[in-house]
Amino acid sequence: GNERFRCPETLFQPSFIGMESAGIHETTYNSIMKCDIDIRKDLYANNVMSGGTTMYPGIADRMQKEITALAPSTMKIKIIAPPERKYSVWIGGSILASLSTFQQMWITKQEYDEAGPSIVHRKCF
């Protein structure tokens, strides 16, 4: 039925489900615009879609169309949607967790049990 359309469309139009928030294309655009003007060209040309929510057919083409409509007309927009993107978030987290520089941010169960959620802010920010 039309759920196949409505479900992924919610990513671009959250108002479909009563949410007053920006779609993924607007959030991407707003994030790029908050960055230094000297790197925006690179950011527009290197958008990588990741996670299971991006597995909808045609989502990369739709993202390309929507970002192109928002960006300056001379800007090259490139949306990368690797076939393994369903697991790329987990893979990225796995790589990050294995870096020796990240170990100082590890939180043990004992630390969390003793300090609660505030330990995350103390160790990670």
From Swiss-Prot:
- Superkingdom of this protein's organism: Eukaryota
From the UniProt annotation, give the residues forming the signal peptide. none
**Pfam families referenced in this protein's UniProt entry, alphabetically:** Actin
SMART domains xref list: ACTIN (SM00268)
Locations listed in the record:
Cytoplasm, Cytoskeleton
InterPro entries hit by this protein: Actin, Actin_CS, ATPase_NBD
What the protein does? Actins are highly conserved proteins that are involved in various types of cell motility and are ubiquitously expressed in all eukaryotic cells.
Q: Which PANTHER family match?
A: ACTIN
Query: Oligomeric state and partners?
Result: Polymerization of globular actin (G-actin) leads to a structural filament (F-actin) in the form of a two-stranded helix. Each actin can bind to 4 others.
**What name has this protein been given in UniProt?**
Actin, alpha skeletal muscle
Give the originating organism. Pleurodeles waltl (Iberian ribbed newt)
Q: What is the lineage of its organism?
A: Eukaryota, Metazoa, Chordata, Craniata, Vertebrata
